[in-house]
């Protein structure tokens, strides 16, 4: 998947748990959980939906590395190319 496809997958996964969120509302350099008002359970459901659509797992140890949309997209691109 290219970066645009990954971004669309991320937005769709966010909308699974927060359907009111529009992709253009997300500041790519701000904390994703705060931008989308995701509590810890919402965040886990979001990551599960993302794994289902991309086949890329983000282990708990890496949660701190993917706290913004840009960081998450970078992470997914690296993981997808391995």
Residue ranges and their predicted role:
Residues 2-38, 42-45, 52-53, 57-82:
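Phosphopantetheine-dependent thiolation modules in NRPS/PKS and related acyl-activating systems
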